[in-house]
Amino acid sequence: MKNNQNLIWIDLEMTGLEPEQDRIIEMATIVTDPQLNILAEGPVIAVSQPKILLDSMDAWNTKQHNQSGLVKRVLESNVSESQAEQLTIEFLKQYVDKGKSPMCGNSICQDRRFLYKYMPELAAYFHYRNLDVSSLKELVLRWRPELMNGVVKESKHLALDDIKDSINELIYYRQHFINLPEVKNDK
């Protein structure tokens, strides 16, 4: 099952966008093979944070994370950032060695900033490169904007769902923008 060509996809939900004041409240990972077939879903973790921090979120985050049920899950969670980091690393070790997979996702630089600050061991597990689907999106918007009509995203702002959206978005770009044929699962 371990293959250093596998890709690690990660998404974080945070209380805001500033690592100096905001915190991670949910994280999830998925491992795919190089052809983007899902091999395994990692733990989906609501990270315990104090109510005072959640109460200080801006209006958008407050509305979004309350409507999704994430605030309730965070308040009920007893999993610390450190525990979430270790659970995730233990999962990833089964599928890819440290330093081999780029960090994969959408706007992944933002997630990397929070990992550097709050989960440095997990940040170091990734290769320094990124596979950022949002880079392709920016090119499509500029070069082939008509293709954006075919991108279907649920945008639930829940970590696992967002990763699946990112994988499906990359598959769409592979077929319609990069023009590679659909790759069948070899399993």
UniProtKB/Swiss-Prot annotation:
Residues 7-170 form the Exonuclease domain. The active site is at residue 128. Gene3D superfamilies: Ribonuclease H-like superfamily/Ribonuclease H (3.30.420.10). Its main location: cytoplasm. SMART domains: EXOIII. It is found in: Cytoplasm. GO terms for biological process: DNA metabolic process. Keywords: Cytoplasm, Exonuclease, Hydrolase, Nuclease. Its EC number is 3.1.15.-. GO terms for molecular function: 3'-5'-RNA exonuclease activity; nucleic acid binding. GO terms for cellular component: cytoplasm. The keyword Nuclease applies. It is an enzyme of class 3 (hydrolase). It holds the Pfam family RNase_T. Belongs to the oligoribonuclease family. 3'-to-5' exoribonuclease specific for small oligoribonucleotides. PANTHER family: OLIGORIBONUCLEASE, MITOCHONDRIAL. NCBIfam families: PRK05359.1. This is Oligoribonuclease. The lineage of its organism: Bacteria, Pseudomonadati, Pseudomonadota, Gammaproteobacteria, Legionellales. The gene is orn.
